[in-house]
Amino acid sequence: MIGPFKKVLVITSFNEKLYNEYAHRFLKTYNWPFDLKIYSEKKFNITYKDYKVIELGQDSKDFVQRNKNRPVKDFWVDGVRFSYKVYSVIESGLQAINENTYDILIWVDADSVFHNPLTLDFIKEHIYKEDSMMTYLGRGGMYSECGFLSWNLKHKDTKNYFEDMKKMYNEDLLYKEKEYHDSYIWDLIRIKFEKEYNTKNINIGDQAKGHVQARSVLGEIYDHVKGPRRKLQGFSAESKHFNLNLKGRK
C-alpha cells in the first residue's frame, strides 16, 4: 500500500499558439502513468494521440473580459495572462473534490519536457503527506516557482483554498495586491491558511533564487524549460540531472 491516495490527476493549460510553439513537446514526452487534462481559453484540435482540450468556463471568460484592457508593464502585474492557469486548477480541483474522482491534483506548466515517469513511491516520498494541503517550490524571500504545484484533494482545507482563490479572481481582489501574477496570489492564500488555520504544506524548493525546479528532486523527473533562452536551447542548463539538448525535438 503506497498511501491513502489512489488516483492522481495531472493538468496543464495552453492555447493553439503555445501548442505549436512548445507545448507539443509536453504531450510528446508525457510519460507519467496518470490521467492528463488540458485546459484552454478556447477549444482546438490536437492530432497527437487522443488528447482533448477542455474549454475553460464562464468565470474565466468573464474575468478576462473585465480586465483585458488593464495596462501591463511587466508580468508582475499581468493578471489576465496567468489567470487561465488559476481557473484550470480551480475548475478541475473543485470538480474532483465534489465528484470524489481524484485524490491528488498536480499542475505542470506546458513548457515542460518529461524524462522519467513520476511514480506513486516518488509522490509518497517527496510530494504527499496525509496532513499537508499542498506542495510547492519555495524560493526564500521571493514568490514561489509555480510551474509545479500539487494539492491533496482529501485534505480538509483544500476546497476552501480553491474557493478563496476563486474569490480573488471572480471579484478582482488580486488587483488590490502588490503583484497580480499567479505565483504571488497562490503564495498569498497559502500563507493565509498557514497563519489562520495552521495548515501544513510541503516546500520542496531550496529557498534560493533562480531555476529551483531544475535543482529540486523534480529535476530528476522532468525539465521545466522556462524562459526564452532555455526554450531556444531546448533544455535547462541548470539541471544537474540532465544534459540533453532537446532543440531538435519537433
Region roles according to the model:
Residues M1-K73, V80, Q95-T101, L153-D157, ...:
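N-terminal anchoring/stem segment of glycosyltransferases
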Residues H24, S83-Y87, Y180-L188:
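A structural signal for well-ordered alpha-helical segments within the folded catalytic domains
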Residues H155-K250:
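Catalytic core and acceptor-binding pocket of nucleotide-sugar-dependent glycosyltransferases
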Residues S83-T135:
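GT-A fold catalytic core of metal-dependent nucleotide-sugar glycosyltransferases
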Residues K37-S40, I104-D109, F114, M134-Y136, ...:
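A structural signal for short, well-ordered beta-strand segments and their strand-loop junctions
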Residues H115-H181:
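Conserved catalytic core of nucleotide-sugar-dependent glycosyltransferases
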Residues N20-R25, L120-D121, Y184:
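Well-ordered, non-membrane alpha-helical segments in soluble/globular domains
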Residues V10, V89, L149, W186-I189:
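A residue-level signal for conserved active-site and pocket-lining positions in enzyme catalytic cores
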